[in-house]
Amino acid sequence: MFAVFWTNLRCLGYNTFTCGVETPTTWGKVGSLDASSSTFTTYRGYPLAMAISAGTPACDSPDDNIRRAINTLRADLSALLRGESVAYSAFLSACTKFDGFAQSCHGMLSDDTLDLLYSFSESLLALSENMALLETKKEAESNKFTAEVMAILSDKTSGLDLSDDKNEPTSPTPAYVEPCARWLKDNWYNPYPSGEVRTQIARQTRTSRKDIDAWFIDARRRIGWNEVRRKHFENKRVDIVRAASIFTGPQSIPAEVDALPDHIELEFAGILSRARSLYEEKFSPSKLAVKLDTAVKDMTPSLKEQLKNDEARRKREASTVGIINQRARHAYPTPERSPASAAELLASPPSFAIDSDKLPSVGRKRRRSLESDETVSSPLCKRPRSQSVFCELSPVKGLPSPSPSTQDELLETSAAPSPQPSLLPKLTPTDSARSTGKRKRRLSDGFQYPAAKRPEIRPQVVSDPFPATSSEHWEQWFREHVLSSPELTLTGDIPPAVTTDAPDSNTPLDIQLFNFPLIPDLPPSVPVVPAPTAELNIIEPLEVPAVTQVNVDPEATALDHTFSWMASDFPPPLQSTNTFPSSSPFSALDGMSLPFPDTRSSAFLPDPSLWSNISDPDLDFSTVFSQPSTNSAMTSSIQVPLQPTWLTSRSLSEQEREAKRKELEELEARAQAIRAEISAP
């Protein structure tokens, strides 16, 4: 009875009773069995058998031992089924020994003990059979479940991409373009891919077959294949493919086949070029990419480590150099050289000393402020770097203000106006330093000119962009352009004040006129006569005929006070071309102090049209001017003052000229009326 149970129990194995239980290596032995003897010792503290060989009864009867063993095994089996910590191997070994012990003492057991033993064995048998069946079905269902899950996963994950699309850059061109363009570049002579090729490209790029077919149709058109096929091969696919194959491999052409014409070869060369550019323009790596790829491939781990060490070493060297330069920059300055000897003091300063006359005025003030700051500061303090650099640039420490005597001379020179410029004495650095009274202490002359550490000819930035002109240049320019002029006679003395006396009406006038050109834009019909102003400040010369004379009352025509200065023997007038009249009033003072134009010009001759309506007897002015009347064509011109030329230099517009002409006509009419009144008896 127990044999079937133990056999089924062994067939179930470890997994039947140990699901979720610790491994057997961690279990301790629940019972112990002495293998050297056939006597069971204990199982969980209970004796299992007695010595059979001697037949001596044990301490307890076999019934008691069997009952206690069955109870213990039933409890351990329940614990084993619940997954508690029970040693499966120890339980199985105990059951085997218990089976042998029960068979050995079968005849000594009572009926109650046998009934208990049979019931326990039946329950174990049913349990073992069900457990064995369960294990078989479990294994079958597990295998079936695994197969179904793998089938589902393989079906659902076939279209999935395990790569992270978010990290990959999205390309503007579809994925199928690159393999199609690569195939077309390699097979341009027969751009008709088979169905297998197009299906493979569609499967690799997860694209529909329709898109692949459409791309190849458009590509043949773009490379010019269709045009050449229609133009030279009567739209026959076989002929153009054969000709393209001949163009691709001329060495494989049979002898009886003629070579392709030149224009056909030229067409195929264009197709080949366009097919290659279709791929290389977008997908072929550039020269820089190839070079970088080669450099990355050649970059071994040891080379990377070496480059990293070199970079760290360069950084350390750069930091060290920076620290050294900083320390040198803040170091205490070197002492200046010792005082020079007497011979060096008497010698001229070196060539790099800056002349005080060459420096701009703004620069002098700035350098003097730097010097004053340096002298006030304590000698124990370090000199600022800006001042030390300035000392290297210029050996002259500063240019102080001129001495009081020089300032007095300047004040006197500026107060007294003189045509000649005042020459200022040049101030040397030594004299200027001696003239200052603010400096407390000064180094010797040997310290004034340290060795120049920079080039002598070096541009310096100053506040005044225009350098000051020296007095020598100004004096030379004054001598060349002013003193050398023959019109000027400068004596160097201050001229006396100019006084103007009241004019004497009895004093004859000496009038000289400038030679200005005539107005070229006057029409020939208009007489060239200066237009008198509204105040009649210009009196035209009257041409008096000497043929007829009219007796005029001396009292009515007495011009003693006005024309007493007009003598008969006038000097010959000068020739003048001034014809610029002016409308401004003319005073007697201006006529006496300013030169006037020549009255011999045609501008001072009367208009003949004004005398056409007057008879000859009416125009005899011999009695007025106390001159004999003659029949000759000689005329007597009266010299009258005109306006100065600087008042008539402005050109007139057309409106102004028209107004002047109208004004001139009115004045001429008025003058004609006055002449008629004068000539009346």
From Swiss-Prot:
Pfam families: Homeobox_KN, Mating_C, Mating_N. GO terms for molecular function: DNA binding. Residues 165-227 bind DNA. It is found in: Nucleus. Residues 307-341, 353-381, 394-466 are annotated as: Disordered. The keyword Nucleus applies. Residues 413-430 have a biased composition (Low complexity). GO terms for biological process: regulation of DNA-templated transcription. GO terms for cellular component: nucleus. InterPro entries: HD (IPR001356), Homeodomain-like_sf (IPR009057), Homeodomain1_C (IPR024441), KN_HD (IPR008422), Mating-type_A-alpha/beta_1_N (IPR024333). Keywords: DNA-binding, Homeobox, Nucleus, Transcription, Transcription regulation. It comes from the Eukaryota. SMART domains: HOX. The keyword Nucleotide-binding does not apply. Residues 307-318 have a biased composition (Basic and acidic residues). Has a major regulatory role in sexual and asexual development. It may bind DNA itself or it may have a role in preventing DNA-binding of another protein. May dimerize. Belongs to the TALE/M-ATYP homeobox family. The C-terminal domain has a high percentage of Ser, Pro and Thr residues. This is Mating-type protein beta1-1. The lineage of its organism: Eukaryota, Fungi, Dikarya, Basidiomycota, Agaricomycotina.
